[in-house]
C-alpha cells in the first residue's frame, strides 16, 4: 500500500528543500517527524506539513496503521520561478527570480 501527498509551488528553492528531504528518506514516520520538528530550516516546516498530509491521507483513504508506515520516497522538483524586478542605479532594473518547487512524499510499509 502506498499513499502520496504533493505540494505544488512551494515558495522555497528546490536546492534548499532537498537538503531536508534527504534527511528523512526511508525513515519511519515517527522518527522523520521528530527530525523535521527540531530542524531549524524553513524547508523542514514545509516538508513536515506534506508528510502530515500524507499521514492523514493514509488514515482517511486507506485506513492504515500509522505505526507501520515509513517514508518510502520523497523527491523535490524545480517548479516555475516568479520573476521580479529590483531597482538599480541610473534608472535601470535587474531581474530577480524567486524559486519555487514541487514536493512529493510517498508513504508505504
UniProtKB/Swiss-Prot annotation:
Example of a GO MF term: structural constituent of ribosome
An example GO CC term for this entry is: cytosolic large ribosomal subunit
Q: Which InterPro entries match?
A: Ribosomal_uL22, Ribosomal_uL22_bac/chlpt-type, Ribosomal_uL22_bac/org-type, Ribosomal_uL22_CS, Ribosomal_uL22_sf
Magnesium: present as a keyword of the record? no
Q: What keywords are annotated for this sequence in UniProt?
A: Ribonucleoprotein, Ribosomal protein, RNA-binding, rRNA-binding
Keyword RNA-binding among UniProt keywords = yes
Q: What does this protein do?
A: This protein binds specifically to 23S rRNA; its binding is stimulated by other ribosomal proteins, e.g. L4, L17, and L20. It is important during the early stages of 50S assembly. It makes multiple contacts with different domains of the 23S rRNA in the assembled 50S subunit and ribosome.
Record's subunit section: Part of the 50S ribosomal subunit.
| Family from the record | Belongs to the universal ribosomal protein uL22 family.
The protein in question is named Large ribosomal subunit protein uL22
Q: Which organism is it from?
A: Cupriavidus metallidurans (strain ATCC 43123 / DSM 2839 / NBRC 102507 / CH34)
Gene name per UniProt: rplV
Amino acid at each position: 500500500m502506498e499513499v502520496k501527498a504533493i505540494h505544488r509551488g512551494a515558495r522555497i528553492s528546490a536546492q534548499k528543500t532537498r537538503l531536508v528531504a534527504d534527511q528523512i528518506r526511508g525513515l519511519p514516520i515517527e522518527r522523520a517527524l521528530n527530525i523535521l520538528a527540531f530542524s531549524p530550516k524553513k524547508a523542514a516546516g514545509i516538508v513536515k506539513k506534506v508528510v502530515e498530509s500524507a499521514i492523514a491521507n493514509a488514515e482517511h483513504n486507506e485506513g492504515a496503521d500509522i505505526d507501520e508506515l515509513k517514508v518510502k520516497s520523497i523527491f523535490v522538483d524545480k517548479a516555475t520561478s516568479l520573476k521580479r524586478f529590483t531597482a538599480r542605479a541610473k534608472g535601470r532594473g535587474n531581474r530577480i527570480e524567486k524559486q519555487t518547487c514541487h514536493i512529493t512524499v510517498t508513504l508505504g510499509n
